Regions:
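Alpha-helical membrane-anchoring segments
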Residues: 1-366
Length: 366
């Protein structure tokens, strides 16, 4: 006897909205109006410690649209959400997290399709899994992050001694993507995704780390599980959906040519992100008490991600533009430009010997 769990496009978008709402709650400092511990980094302009007055209206519109979209997933409500989210991300690029991008794409795919929605969503999830696995085929994941995940539990710590297992996990994740788009899918394969994401969630809970992505993992497992059920949506994605799938499935390749953002390239737990460190001979009061709690090198250096995660619950958005913004913002802490600088660390995903740093003086960041 075969057991199926069919679900409509309305049900799928409700899963996405629930996941998005939970992620936003776990990163409330990133979204709420008012003063910010970590500044906004807008697409245009400089870093700011306040969200601005009219942002309150945008935030209220977003919350209302999410609620209405969940209650009655009609296109007139769903269309607003990707637009509002992208505007809010433009006002602070830190909001453009991988999970934000994923939910924007899911909602936009549902809003632009009818019978083709299930097919398009399968291809979207396939892109995330395939790129998520492919980006992990590096020593930074197999030698470091995989070992860290294994060491969360004493009983599995020994597995981290075998980098080959890390590469195996990466390949398995890619296989999960392929299974979603095979012509003869088996409904029980959906349990593979539930198991995969459950292990990630359990590890994050045990490590007391990165809680904000737990709802994303839960939503992805639910979407994948239900998308293995038979449906009537066998139509090819329409032009709008094809464009969205192009962004999800092909643009991550452009990251390796410095033409696409790290956060939008499904670099999930790869440990290959660029890092910004601010150096100051004296504590910077713009960071509040985070400098005292998180600084190192005798209190002279602060990893900017530590500050962002402490205040917002997420890492900062990585780009030359945002690094310069945060550098200028922190340089205002000291009147002596010779006592402060921004240090950027870049890695080559496949060559650990190729790490290099770029140092900007505050004078250069002007």
């Amino acid at each position: 006897m075969r057991v199926y769990f069919p679900i409509s496009a309305d049900g799928l978008v409700r899963i996405a909205l629930a996941g998005l709402g939970a992620c936003m709650l776990l990163s409330a400092g990133l979204w709420l109006p008012g003063e910010r511990g970590f500044p906004t980094l807008p697409l245009l302009g400089d870093a700011a410690a306040h969200t601005g007055r009219w942002y309150v209206v945008l935030f209220a519109l977003l919350c209302a649209s999410m609620l209405m979209g969940f209650i009655r997933p009609q296109k007139k409500f769903l269309w607003r959400l990707p637009v509002l989210l992208l505007i809010m991300c433009a006002l602070d690029l830190n909001r453009l997290q991988p999970w934000t991008w994923f939910f924007i794409l899911v909602i936009a795919i549902v809003a632009t399709g009818t019978t083709s929605t299930h097919t398009a969503l399968r291809w979207l999830l396939a892109a995330v899994y395939i790129w998520g696995g492919a980006n992990k085929l590096t020593p930074y994941f197999a030698d470091e992050n995989f070992r860290w995940f294994c060491e969360v539990f004493e009983s599995t710590a020994f597995l981290g001694q075998y980098p080959a297992l890390g590469y195996t996990v990466a390949v398995f994740e890619m296989i999960l993507g392929v299974l979603l788009v095979l012509p003869h899918r088996k409904p029980f394969w959906g349990w593979l995704y539930v198991t995969f994401h459950s292990l990630i969630i359990i590890s994050l809970l045990a490590a007391h780390w990165n809680y904000v992505v737990i709802p994303w993992n839960a939503a992805m497992s639910a979407l994948a599980f239900f998308l293995f059920s038979p449906d009537d949506g066998k139509k090819r994605p329409n032009n709008a959906q094809a464009f969205l799938l192009l962004l999800a499935g092909f643009m991550p390749l452009a990251y390796y040519f410095n033409a696409w953002p790290y956060q939008l390239s499904w670099q999930l737990y790869t440990n290959t992100q660029p890092e910004a460190v601010f150096f100051s001979e004296q504590p910077c009061d713009k960071t509040g008490d985070v400098w005292q709690k998180k600084s190192f090198d005798d209190g002279r250096r602060l990893l900017v991600d530590d500050w962002s995660i402490e205040e917002l619950g997420v890492p900062m958005f990585y780009s030359e533009h945002t690094f310069r913004q945060i550098g200028r913002y922190l340089c205002a802490c000291s009147p002596d430009f010779y006592q402060t600088r921004l240090i950027l660390l870049y890695v080559d995903p496949w060559d650990k010997e190729a790490e290099h740093t770029t140092i900007y003086s505050c004078e250069e960041l002007k």
